[in-house]
């Protein structure tokens, strides 16, 4: 296989990885609390094995931390965050962070997320008395009627994306300055129109690399036939 094929293959691989990331963003443009993912690549210069050629290397992806829009729905247990920070839920004994505030009260009167995981307050799971009106202040203080029952754990720090809209800490977490908004949800921060344009561009880039590889392969075949005469 020629060096040009390797160059084209590295470019096609990077283009396809970028296409998959953008496609995932488009698919989750309506997912509550979803943060868009951005791919990044590195241009690798000549080395012992590169033989003077320049390659593109996929270096993974990072998420866009900017806020989505906050949409009011007047459901008392639905919460959104304005600013940097994350809610904390108990994921089988470990902390899972999220911006998805589609919370509800389960049969044990615990505040839980859409997956049934207990939402954490500063003192652990948040239990809400039956039949009381729930009110949540901007600082995360939770009231049942006139009684303060808990304070939401809202944290911030270095995190990595897990699944659709979950995050896990990669370092020490601290208290967040985000404002809690009750009766509202945060939308995805994906710009669907811009993402669709990016998706088309990524598809064309991948196709261009494929065509370049095919052209190089055809040239190699012709040269081999010529050399064999």
Where are these regions (language model features)?
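Amphipathic alpha-helical polymerization modules
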Residues: 1-229
């Amino acid at each position: 296989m020629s060096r040009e094929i390797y160059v084209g293959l590295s470019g096609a691989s990077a283009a396809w990885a970028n296409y998959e990331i953008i496609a995932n963003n488009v698919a989750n443009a309506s997912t509550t609390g979803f943060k868009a993912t951005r791919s990044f690549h590195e241009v690798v210069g000549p080395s012992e094995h590169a033989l003077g050629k320049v390659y593109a290397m996929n270096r993974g992806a990072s998420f866009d931390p900017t806020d989505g829009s906050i949409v009011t729905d007047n459901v008392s247990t639905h919460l959104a965050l304005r600013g940097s920070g994350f809610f904390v839920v108990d994921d089988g004994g470990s902390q899972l962070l999220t911006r998805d505030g589609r919370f509800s009260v389960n049969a044990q009167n615990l505040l839980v997320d859409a997956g049934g995981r207990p939402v954490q307050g500063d003192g652990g799971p948040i239990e809400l008395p039956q039949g009381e009106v729930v009110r949540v202040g901007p600082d995360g203080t939770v009231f049942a009627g006139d009684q303060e029952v808990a304070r939401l754990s809202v944290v911030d720090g270095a995190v990595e994306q897990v699944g659709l809209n979950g995050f896990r800490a990669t370092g020490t977490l601290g208290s967040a300055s985000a404002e809690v908004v009750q009766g509202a949800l945060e939308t995805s921060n994906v710009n669907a129109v811009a993402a669709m344009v990016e998706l088309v561009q990524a598809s064309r880039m991948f196709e261009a690399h494929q065509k370049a590889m095919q052209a190089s392969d055809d040239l190699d075949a012709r040269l081999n036939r010529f050399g064999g005469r």
